[in-house]
Amino acid sequence: MPIGVPKVPFRSPGEEDAVWVDIYNRLHRERLLFLGQGVDSEISNQLVGLMVYLSMEDNTRDLYLFINSPGGWVIPGIAIYDAMQIVPPDVHTICMGLAASMGSFILVGGEFTKRLAFPHARVMIHQPASSFYEAQAGEFILEAEELLKLREILTRVYVQRTGKPLWVVSEDMERDVFMSATEAQAHGIVDLVAVENSADFV
């Protein structure tokens, strides 16, 4: 039987009594954000809205984005990435579990020196795929042209943010490339790998 979203007590400043709020609302108040599903327009809009709101509330405190995502749609993923670059606070990205496809693209978009992977996390990069497998010829050509443009955008970002040469990134994106946390660090996708029982990083 599903239990729904857990609720935790929260006391607003100046209030005597705590109220019960869902755990994600409580964590958002601490500037902790979560991408724990496939990337689509709904989660993209939620995360962008939260980043903008929290930036307006206090543009000096860092944001923390925890990622455990199999990837998803390219354009909503790019929207999250762009918002991370535009909001004034630094955005830490933390990979837990899996950051695949657009999940890894968002992971690499964290502030330099503030991208982290848990020790047993996995990262996967590849090129964007088409959704028009049964399209008419004309539609397929237009889709192919758009895919090439999107691939160029993603490749350019990976090159810029990993420091790897264009030919290395292009070759890696030809197929599904899975990496361990330490391999992702060597590849420049994350800067740090968390160690067990380390000091509190939040």
Curated annotation (Swiss-Prot):
One of its GO terms (cellular component) is chloroplast stroma. The active site is at residues 101, 126. It is an enzyme of class 3 (hydrolase). Keywords: Chloroplast, Hydrolase, Plastid, Protease, Serine protease. It is found in: Plastid, Chloroplast stroma. Its EC number is 3.4.21.92. It holds the Pfam family CLP_protease. GO terms for molecular function: ATP-dependent peptidase activity; ATPase binding; serine-type endopeptidase activity. Its main location: plastid. SUPFAM superfamilies: ClpP/crotonase. It catalyses: Hydrolysis of proteins to small peptides in the presence of ATP and magnesium. alpha-casein is the usual test substrate. In the absence of ATP, only oligopeptides shorter than five residues are hydrolyzed (such as succinyl-Leu-Tyr-|-NHMec, and Leu-Tyr-Leu-|-Tyr-Trp, in which cleavage of the -Tyr-|-Leu- and -Tyr-|-Trp bonds also occurs). It comes from the Eukaryota. GO terms for biological process: protein quality control for misfolded or incompletely synthesized proteins. Belongs to the peptidase S14 family. Cleaves peptides in various proteins in a process that requires ATP hydrolysis. Has a chymotrypsin-like activity. Plays a major role in the degradation of misfolded proteins. Component of the chloroplastic Clp protease core complex. This is ATP-dependent Clp protease proteolytic subunit. It comes from Nuphar advena (Common spatterdock). The lineage of its organism: Eukaryota, Viridiplantae, Streptophyta, Embryophyta, Tracheophyta. The gene is clpP.
